[in-house]
Amino acid sequence: MPAAQHHPSTPDGRYFVVRGRLWRLSNPHLAPDVRQQLVDQLMRARREAGLAVKAGDKEAERRARAAVDAAKHALGERGPVWWDDGAPDYNRRLVANTPYAAWYAALPAGDRD
């Protein structure tokens, strides 16, 4: 099994970076057991989506993708931001086009993806 990839997280803990793009992290204020239940739901929905695609079942795929979206919203990875300081959301934006650009550029090359 390949080693887990490391993706750098922003200093404020709001995002991680994959191929130069910011992705919102889960809400760190979720209770560990709640977070685990939501992650389990997310993984189950992702598996169901993959099976539906392989089976060519468009309705099952739609339901599974809706379940993925619901789990991601509950985790805080989509929808309203989980922080309350009024900072804007840069989810899915290129890090180079955000206030995190200098931080990312300063990372050692081996820490960038």
Residue locations for each model-derived region?
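Extended, charge-rich alpha-helical interface modules
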Residues: 2-113
